[in-house]
Curated annotation (Swiss-Prot):
pH-related activity note: Optimum pH is 7.0-8.0.
Example GO BP: monosaccharide metabolic process
Gene Ontology CC terms: Golgi cisterna membrane; membrane
Family: Belongs to the galactose-3-O-sulfotransferase family.
Top enzyme class: transferase
UniProt-listed InterPro entries: Gal-3-0_sulfotransfrase (IPR009729), P-loop_NTPase (IPR027417)
Name of the featured protein: Galactose-3-O-sulfotransferase 3
Cofactors that this protein relies on: Mg(2+)
Amino acid sequence: MPPILQRLQQATKMMSRRKILLLVLGCSTVSLLIHQGAQLSWYPKLFPLSCPPLRNSPPRPKHMTVAFLKTHKTAGTTVQNILFRFAERHNLTVALPHPSCEHQFCYPRNFSAHFVHPATRPPHVLASHLRFDRAELERLMPPSTVYVTILREPAAMFESLFSYYNQYCPAFRRVPNASLEAFLRAPEAYYRAGEHFAMFAHNTLAYDLGGDNERSPRDDAAYLAGLIRQVEEVFSLVMIAEYFDESLVLLRRLLAWDLDDVLYAKLNARAASSRLAAIPAALARAARTWNALDAGLYDHFNATFWRHVARAGRACVEREARELREARQRLLRRCFGDEPLLRPAAQIRTKQLQPWQPSRKVDIMGYDLPGGGAGPATEACLKLAMPEVQYSNYLLRKQKRRGGARARPEPVLDNPPPRPIRVLPRGPQGP
């Protein structure tokens, strides 16, 4: 056979082998996808993320001990719900308040380990409101605990505090016509240090973090610097509410969680009629001036947050955040219909999903399940949108019945929410 024909025959054989190889690979891929499809939970399964780990290290198991300092009006309820659901899926114990504290750890008192219900000790996860006390948390939580918190831009946060706590904070009740502008024009005319719930009217972030909210960085810059150092010594991650999805990407990477573990529904959100569409610049400046300690904390940790993003790779974090948003939309559609809408509490038929309303002047929105139904998917969707008080009560009942033993999940029961009462590790240490 002429050489040219021999080369042609060899080339034909090579092409046939490649086609066979591609066909085998294709069939294997389809088979794998079909197999995975049979195992799909209600959480969307994502292909492995393309972002590299934060450090060149072998894969870590998911970290199971987390303390989240839930600050006020910072999207903390949504983060809490993420942690509650993670704890349930992994059969972890969640620290919950003693009944005398209701659904917060006796806030605004300094946290004490005695505020924790005995049926929820020793805990893996803590995520309810408290005023930070490092020594008491060290007594309660395991040494491997990772500490995280979240901050929000002080002007936007203060507008939310003023609206939400208008009927509870004496300083806010004194303001004619419930006018935020009037309060910020002369806050000293309405504010009285030491009054019950006074911390909601002045430097609330600093107070939640265990600081003295009456200090002013203009008069004592060293105090702000010292408070920042204390926060940095304890918290491995300070999330930023304005960059919520990016914060969750950093959180899941810190804890070696999957992106599925941080999917969420936005909780405890006010109706548009209950909030300012936009805070005027002059009002924002006045709010930051009055809450100068909070402004200093936020500005510092906002800058720190973006340094974390840069170390992780900004393009990588943005890509993961986009994947998170897409997966979240799929999840919400699956649970609440093609157009999931936040609804007023009066329009929510499912009692377990009716959010508590702080006053007649504020509408807190929630979700509802489309029609009846039962089974794991409905139960999971219910937990995704369950308000804080109902979920806390449910977990407490479950953990009390468990009595330390690992029991099967129980169904969620109706439980109308009550009115509210008035050196740690820098990162994960093993599994």
